[in-house]
Swiss-Prot record:
The lineage of its organism: Bacteria, Bacillati, Bacillota, Bacilli, Bacillales. It comes from the Bacteria. It catalyses: L-alanine + NAD(+) + H2O = pyruvate + NH4(+) + NADH + H(+). PROSITE patterns: ALADH_PNT_1, ALADH_PNT_2. Pathway: Amino-acid degradation; L-alanine degradation via dehydrogenase pathway; NH(3) and pyruvate from L-alanine: step 1/1. Catalyzes the reversible reductive amination of pyruvate to L-alanine. A key factor in the assimilation of L-alanine as an energy source via the tricarboxylic acid cycle during sporulation. Substrate binds at R15, K75. Homohexamer. The gene is ald. One of its GO terms (cellular component) is plasma membrane. The keyword Lipoprotein does not apply. Its EC number is 1.4.1.1. Belongs to the AlaDH/PNT family. This is Alanine dehydrogenase.
Length: 372
């Protein structure tokens, strides 16, 4: 199979969908790999490294990468990339379609086979292709939150770890999954007063065992969320419902916070969990202030640490890409239930129910199309 790797064009998106080692894996399996010129530069990979690994040396433009049978990316396509959509194109990337109506309509209209990293799901409910980026974003969330709590960045001037005789900063993390757990690790490491909320009592027990008395765990409900948000210096939104939006923090709750507090919405690429995160920001202009509260809503947080992120991402995506390339998407997905859950669009239909619901568009069962 011909596999294309275009250069990411989203603002400050320095990750790339494949490392030279990944190229070598695919080439050794008999596939052709086309990496756009300087596609890996942001992650520290040169064109010559890709060529030595077996990538075609004649790929120079977006067009060359996008004309492949399968395109591997990191982030959802931007409007100027829609021109390369065509029936049967396999697009394997983070799609986050529930929060991207324009992208959804484009892949449906052009009958693109849209396979989303974030909805590939194992039998135990875990999301193996989302996990590494959730780890990165979770750890970054408290780092950037601490930075924007500084007065020169619009914050209230709080040091999260405090100093002797001065209270520590209060951090609330909504969601105790991978991102939330990693946020807590950094918060605890900085010496902050950390509270984690989750709807799963068993998960709260696990977090209590993991962190002991270094964190407070609370059952997530509207009452506890409102109380914690009001008292916090930094709130991290780390809730993900695969393929869907999850607005948990109301505008009224945000209004109750003291001026200069900070919200970091890790889930903004899926629509976010705060009613007041009404826009997506960029690494160039990462924050805005609403009701006196600093909002950080960068949709590609791991793009700021591309070297780490690219290795972490491709470690988990390449085995699935190899399965698609070896068997084709139909057989590959039918043979692997986890990969089957990754299909969001197929033959002009939305086949992931949460995406269809998010845009009030028709839903079609994927099996009826794959077996048709």
């Amino acid at each position: 199979m011909k596999i294309g790797i275009p250069k990411e064009i989203k603002n400050n998106e320095n990750r790339v969908a494949i490392t030279p080692a990944g190229v070598m894996t695919l080439v050794k399996a008999g596939h052709e790999v086309y990496v756009e010129t300087e596609g890996g530069a942001g992650s520290g990979f040169s064109d010559s490294e890709y060529e030595k690994a077996g990538a075609a040396d004649r790929c120079r433009t977006w067009r060359d990468a996008w004309t492949a049978e399968m395109v591997l990316k990191v982030k959802e396509p931007l409007a100027r990339e829609f021109r390369y959509f065509r029936p049967g194109l396999i697009l394997f990337t983070y799609l986050h379609l529930a929060a991207a109506e324009r992208v959804t309509k484009a892949v449906v209209e052009q009958k693109v086979v849209g396979i989303a990293y974030e909805t590939v799901q194992l039998a135990n409910g875990s999301l193996p292709l989302l996990t590494p980026m959730s780890e990165v974003a979770g750890r970054m969330s408290v780092q950037v939150g601490a930075q924007f709590l500084e007065k020169p960045h619009g914050g209230k001037g709080i040091l999260l770890g405090g100093v002797p005789g001065v209270r520590r900063g209060k951090v609330t993390i909504i969601g105790g999954g991978t991102a939330g757990t990693n946020a807590a690790k950094i918060g605890v490491g900085l010496g902050a007063d950390v509270t984690i909320l989750d709807i799963n009592a068993e998960r709260l027990r696990e977090l209590d065992d993991l962190f002991g008395d270094h964190v407070t765990t609370l059952m997530s409900n509207s009452y506890h969320i409102a109380e914690c948000v009001r008292e916090s210096d930094l709130v991290v939104g780390a809730v993900l419902i695969p393929g869907a939006k999850a607005k948990l923090v109301t505008e009224e709750m945000v209004r109750s916070m003291t001026p200069g507090s900070v919200l970091v919405d890790i889930a903004i690429d899926q629509g976010g969990i705060f009613e007041t995160t009404d826009r997506v920001t960029t690494h160039d202009d990462p924050t805005y202030v609403k009701h006196g509260v600093v909002h950080y809503a960068v949709a590609n947080m791991p793009g700021a640490v591309p070297r780490t992120s690219t290795f972490a991402l491709t470690n988990v995506t390449i085995p699935y890409a190899l399965q698609i390339a070896n068997k084709g998407y139909r057989a590959g997905c039918l043979d692997n239930p986890a990969l089957l859950k990754g299909i969001n669009t197929l033959d002009g239909h939305i086949v992931y129910e949460a995406v269809a619901a998010a845009h009030n568009m028709p839903y079609t069962d994927v099996h009826s199309l794959l077996h048709g």
